[in-house]
Structure formats: structure tokens, C-alpha cells
């Protein structure tokens, strides 16, 4: 019987099974008392690094799935905060504000030392607070560059190995046969992964720190918006009473443009297309009809309108809101300020839109070229959070010919990259 079995032990003496069981119980109690490694503290509530890492990884994977790289999203999320396993960081988070700790470099070092594809994630992890770094050089003196950061000494963070397993990368960043500019394609991929990470990090932290934060999302699906659009245009397509023959001809032409756009939206594969319609031809509504059909047919997530002038943005956004509903359209430019400090209980809708400006989490976005391209080329996390939500979206550039000539090449290159990958 196990209860009376005897085992040889150290010192030549024998232990009964009960003694072994008691020893195991004490060991488990010690494990239970083992130091908890914390990522965040809010009042009496605590979030461990492992909890935060898993939460961030799952969100980043969900974001990266839009362009087929959920394995990369999960990996960068799991490794981004392993520097918090250092003793100095744990002292700091427990209240020692005199300690300064760089917790971002540790994960970047791990990825760089693993080599291969993992090295790409070094940029994202190193910059997830300070901003996406330049590469620099191994012998360079720029401490803010990636190589400058990697040369820094960091505190011992090896305890991460007890809780965090390094996930596998199963895919390549992009298909090299589909690009003629692999370096540029890689830079866009890094920015996309950076966006997935910083937005996921913000959102998981926000969910813990602000339990009563207004819920993000909660908008209507694109299929529901398409139904509203169809109901809206029915009055034009079925109109029979015209004041004159000229009005009848004009309405007929507008309806034909609209129906052609909707038909093409359902038929064409994802790509880059142009729409040329004379002034007064109903281009705004027709382009929305195309976008809704194309997004649904291609299983895309949202529609982004990029417009050069705020006056046109205001007009178009008002049209879209009247058709699709207030809560489904985000107008984002310098002339519109949403206040995150106002009482969200009094104006939940405005507060929700203020949150959406951070990452463009809405079905229809109406914005300026400045906002759009700054997100593609900026290095600050606040600007880049929304970048991943451009993936798998229908993007419409209104009055594209107004784009400044000096910026034309990088802007067109970015558009082509989004369309290709």
C-alpha cells in the first residue's frame, strides 16, 4: 500500500508516503508564495506580467490576422514586457519612484539574439513606448537607435523564462515575389506589427486600469450599413415624377453611375481603381455604394475616406451620418476635437468617438491626407496605433490630384503596398 511504502532517502533513513506527501504539500505552498511579477497596479488590484502579456498577445494576434500575420502578433505581444521581470522594475512598481527602469530593451535583445525572423520584432518591442527607432549602426553613438539600445546593459530579467514561452513564427513577413521593393515592404511590415503591438498594449492596459471605461466598438456591421444604404437610394431609383426632362436625364445618369459602381464593387477583386465622375454626378454616394459592396464581397473591415479639405470632409461626413447612422461614422481631422476628459456618462457617444480617434475602430472613417499618411510614416506610438486598422480596408482618396507633388512618390508607394499586402 502506498500509505506504508518505504523509500530510501538522503542520510540512509526511510520516509513513509505520508512524509513525502507532506513534503510535496510544503513545496506547493512555497510555489504559491513565490513572488508575483506585476505589470500594473491600480488601487488594490494587480495585473501580473503574464496576464498582461497574454492579453496583449491575443489582441495583437487578432489585429495582425487582418493581414495574415496573427502568429507575429501573438509573439510580439508575449515578449514586449519581459523586461518587467527585473527586480528593479518590481521595486519601482511597488512604489519606489526613484528607480528608473528601461523595460523595453530586454525583449528587443531576446529577439535580436534569437536572430532570423525574430530580429524584425526588435524594432517593435524596443519602441513600444519611446517610438519606433531607426536602425543605426553597430559602431554608432546614437543611443536612441535600435543598435544603440541593444548595446545598453539591462537588469537581469531571466525570470521571464519561468512564465513566458517564446512563440513560434510560422509565416514570412511578405512574399518577396510580390514586391519589387523588399526593403520598403519590410519597413511597412514592421510598422504594421508595431501598430498591432502598441494598440493591443494600450487596450489591455486600459481594460485593467479603467474598469468602467466606455466600451469600444458596438457599431453596426457593414451588412447592416449596406441595407441602410439600399433603403436610402431606393427613393432615387424608383423616382418617376420629374419637374423637367433635364432633371429626368440627370437623375437617370446619376442612377446609372451609382448602379455601375455598386455592380463593380461586388465583382472586382481587391486592387487600385479610379472613379471619374463630372461635378454633380453623385460621386460621393456612388463611391460609398462601391465601398460597401466591395468591403462585404472582399470580407474587409471598414471604409476610410481620405479627403484634402476639411470643408469637404464636413459635407461628406454629414451625408454618411444621415445614411449610415451617427455612431458608425468617425470624422477625424484638426478641426474636430473630441474631449476624453468630459463626463462620459453625460455623452457616451462623444466619448466613444474620442476613443475611436486613437485607433480608428469604426466602420467608416472620414479623414485628411495629413492624418492618413502621418500614420503610415510617423514613428510615435500615438500616431501609429490606427495603422493596423488600415489593413483589409477600402480606402478612397477623394480629389487625389490635389496631393502635393513632393509627397506624391512616398504616398503612392504606401498606397501600393497596402493594396499588395
Spans of model-derived segments:
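Accessory nucleic-acid engagement/destabilization modules that flank
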Residues: 17, 24-27, 31-236
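Short basic/glycine-enriched coil/helix segment immediately N-terminal to the Walker B
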Residues: 70, 267, 358-362, 379-393
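Walker A/P-loop
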Residues: 269-291
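Conserved Walker A/P-loop ATP-binding site and its immediately adjacent core
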Residues: 301-323, 336
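Inter-Walker segment of RecA-like/P-loop motor cores
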Residues: 326-377
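SF2 helicase catalytic motif II
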Residues: 383-411, 416-417
Amino acid at each position: 500500500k502506498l500509505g506504508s511504502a518505504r523509500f530510501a532517502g538522503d542520510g540512509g533513513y526511510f520516509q513513509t508516503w505520508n512524509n513525502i506527501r507532506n513534503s510535496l504539500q510544503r513545496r506547493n505552498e512555497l510555489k504559491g508564495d513565490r513572488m508575483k511579477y506585476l505589470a500594473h497596479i491600480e488601487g488594490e488590484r494587480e495585473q501580473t506580467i503574464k496576464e498582461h502579456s497574454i492579453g496583449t498577445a491575443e489582441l495583437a494576434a487578432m489585429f495582425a490576422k487582418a493581414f495574415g500575420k496573427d502568429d507575429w502578433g501573438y509573439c510580439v505581444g508575449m515578449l514586449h514586457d519581459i523586461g518587467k521581470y527585473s527586480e528593479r522594475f518590481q521595486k519601482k512598481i511597488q512604489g519606489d519612484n526613484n528607480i528608473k527602469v528601461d523595460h523595453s530593451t530586454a525583449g528587443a535583445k531576446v529577439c535580436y539574439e534569437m536572430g532570423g525572423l525574430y530580429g524584425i520584432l526588435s524594432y517593435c518591442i524596443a519602441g513600444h513606448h519611446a517610438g519606433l527607432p531607426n536602425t543605426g549602426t553597430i559602431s554608432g553613438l546614437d543611443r536612441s537607435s535600435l543598435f544603440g539600445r541593444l548595446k545598453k546593459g539591462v537588469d537581469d530579467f531571466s525570470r521571464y523564462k519561468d512564465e513566458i514561452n517564446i512563440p513560434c513564427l510560422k509565416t514570412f513577413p511578405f512574399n518577396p515575389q510580390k514586391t519589387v521593393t523588399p526593403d520598403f515592404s519590410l519597413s511597412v511590415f514592421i510598422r504594421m506589427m508595431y501598430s498591432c503591438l502598441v494598440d493591443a498594449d494600450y487596450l489591455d492596459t486600459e481594460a485593467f486600469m479603467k474598469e468602467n471605461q466606455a466600451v469600444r466598438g458596438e457599431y453596426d456591421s457593414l451588412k447592416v450599413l449596406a441595407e441602410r444604404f439600399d433603403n436610402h437610394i431606393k427613393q432615387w431609383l424608383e423616382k418617376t415624377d420629374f419637374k423637367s426632362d433635364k432633371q429626368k436625364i440627370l437623375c437617370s445618369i446619376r442612377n446609372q453611375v451609382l448602379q455601375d459602381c455598386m455592380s463593380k464593387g461586388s465583382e472586382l477583386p481587391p486592387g487600385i481603381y479610379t472613379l471619374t465622375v463630372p461635378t454633380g454626378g453623385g460621386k460621393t454616394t456612388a463611391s460609398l455604394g462601391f465601398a460597401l459592396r466591395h468591403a462585404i464581397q472582399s470580407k474587409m473591415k471598414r471604409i476610410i475616406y481620405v479627403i484634402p479639405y476639411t470643408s469637404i470632409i464636413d459635407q461628406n461626413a454629414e451625408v454618411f451620418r444621415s445614411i449610415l447612422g451617427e455612431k458608425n461614422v468617425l470624422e477625424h481631422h484638426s478641426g474636430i476635437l473630441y474631449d476624453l476628459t468630459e463626463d462620459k456618462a453625460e455623452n457616451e457617444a462623444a466619448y466613444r468617438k474620442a476613443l475611436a480617434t486613437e485607433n480608428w475602430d469604426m466602420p467608416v472613417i472620414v479623414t485628411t491626407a495629413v492624418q492618413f499618411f502621418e500614420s503610415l510614416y510617423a514613428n510615435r506610438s500615438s500616431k501609429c496605433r490606427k495603422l493596423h486598422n488600415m489593413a483589409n480596408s477600402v480606402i478612397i482618396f477623394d480629389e487625389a490630384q490635389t496631393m502635393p507633388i513632393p509627397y506624391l512618390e512616398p504616398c503612392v508607394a504606401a498606397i501600393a503596398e497596402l493594396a499588395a499586402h
